[in-house]
Curated annotation (Swiss-Prot):
Top EC class for this record: transferase
UniProt keyword Chloroplast, yes or no: no
Modified residues (Phosphohistidine): 172
Molecular function as annotated in GO: ATP binding; phosphorelay sensor kinase activity
Domain notes: The N-terminus interacts with KaiC, while the C-terminal histidine kinase domain autophosphorylates and is probably responsible for self-oligomerization. The N-terminal domain stimulates the C-terminus to autophosphorylate.
Top-level division of the source organism's lineage: Bacteria
Every Histidine kinase domain range: 169-391
Gene3D superfamilies: 1.10.287.130, Glutaredoxin (3.40.30.10), Histidine kinase-like ATPase, C-terminal domain (3.30.565.10)
Disulfide pattern: none
Name assigned to this protein: Adaptive-response sensory kinase SasA
């Protein structure tokens, strides 16, 4: 039912027990609305006592469901809900329209009274009409709630389905590096019982290297899954503060020094020290840079080049760019790579599930920045993102 605070009712005082013409007046918050209410009430009160009516005043912002139910497109609007058929008058000249239609409505009311000769039936008809507006509002609210719950259910089912797929992929993909690492460790165990020679020392070093590499692969697979799970089930907690990007980038690059060396990659840095601070969450931005750097290293062939640069693009934004000399990304796929579950054909043999870029976009958008890629097939890719300058 409608809340009493949302409806203001006036009526012909001498006909409270009789059937009456029932009207709904929809008004907005404009100052002129009060004037329209007074004009309509003045006209209705000026009618002869033989013309009973009940007028409910409804504020649009408090009852949007009723506005939708009656399909109103303008305010003020006067809706006759009884006797049937329903009729709507709208615009600034409602009083003139009332003068035209009131005699017809009175005839309709008299016909309804004639048809309902039984007193109980008359009162029931009136009560049903009085409550119809409230029921309509409740039905509209329930309909909206059902739609919202259905949408939420579909989204949850989609998430569960995707997580099942990812778990199956994880179990399959972990098998290979786990087996390789296990063989390396078992071989190391066997070499412990043999005499040390230069050849066995080299073999042990190779086995250690192989085991470390496979453990890194497994760690990356699991990290990817955990990031995706966190992204889909919770909102990001962002702790903004002043952040000096050159220091953050250098710290990350120092951690990757050995990886660049192992793959014989050239690192080119263009990181000016006069870059202004940005307003951002350090851990989340670190996650973005690490993800983009991981991708650049993964797709750049041995002997290739990775470039990291920072640019004070405008007075309001700083831009970070991470470029590689890998296979590039087809133009028609450059937007889709930021979707949650999308993977390029080239990635089928790579570890990971293509979830990192989706998380990166969410983080950057949370910081009111932008993230995009410039790429030409066979010529590499450049990923860029912007962050707001601290003021």
């Amino acid at each position: 039912m409608l809340e009493p605070s949302n409806l203001k009712t006036t009526s012909g005082s001498e006909h409270r027990g009789a059937m009456s013409i029932q009207l709904l007046l929809f008004v907005d918050e404009r100052p002129s609305s009060h004037e329209h209410i007074e004009q309509i009430q003045h006209y209705l009160n000026s009618l002869k006592p033989d013309y009973p009516y009940e007028l409910q005043i409804i504020e649009i912002h408090e009852q949007p469901h009723l506005v939708e139910h009656f399909r109103l497109v303008a305010a003020p609007a006067l809706v006759k809900v009884f006797p049937e058929p329903r009729q709507t008058l709208a615009g600034s000249n409602i009083v003139n329209q009332l003068k035209k239609w009131w005699p017809r409505w009175q005839l309709d009311l008299e016909e309804s009274q004639t048809e309902n000769t039984n007193n109980r039936q008359t009162e029931q008809t009136k009560a049903e009409s009085l409550n119809s507006v409230g029921y309509s509002a409740e039905l509209m609210k329930l309909s909206d709630e059902i739609f919202r719950l259905k949408k939420e259910k579909d989204e949850l089912l989609q998430q569960l389905k995707f997580k099942d797929q990812v778990l199956a992929m994880l179990a399959h993909d972990l098998r290979s590096p786990l087996t390789a690492a296990s063989i390396a460790v078992e071989t190391l165990e066997l070499t412990q019982k043999q005499e040390d020679t230069e050849r066995r020392a080299q073999l042990r070093e190779q086995l250690y290297h192989q085991a470390r590499k496979q453990f890194r692969v497994m760690n990356r697979l699991i990290t990817d899954i955990l990031q995706a799970s966190k992204t889909m089930t919770a909102q990001l907690s962002v702790y903004y503060h002043d952040l000096f990007l050159p220091v953050l980038c250098q710290d990350i690059l120092d951690e990757y020094r050995e990886i660049f060396k192992e793959k014989s990659l050239t690192l080119v840095k263009d990181i000016p020290q006069d870059i202004p601070t940005v307003y951002a969450d350090e851990e989340l931005i670190r996650q973005v840079i690490v993800n983009l750097l991981d991708n650049a290293i993964k797709y750049t062939p041995s002997g290739g080049k990775v470039t990291v640069s920072i640019l004070h693009r405008t007075t309001q934004k700083v831009q970070v760019s991470i470029c590689d000399t890998g296979p590039g990304i087809p133009e028609e796929k450059q937007e889709r790579i930021f979707e949650g579950h999308f993977r390029l054909k080239r990635d089928q043999e790579k570890e990971g599930y293509g979830l990192g870029l989706s998380l990166c976009r969410k983080i950057i958008r949370t910081h009111y920045g932008q993230i995009w890629v410039d790429s030409v097939p066979d010529q590499g890719s450049c990923f860029h993102f912007t962050l707001p300058v601290c003021r």
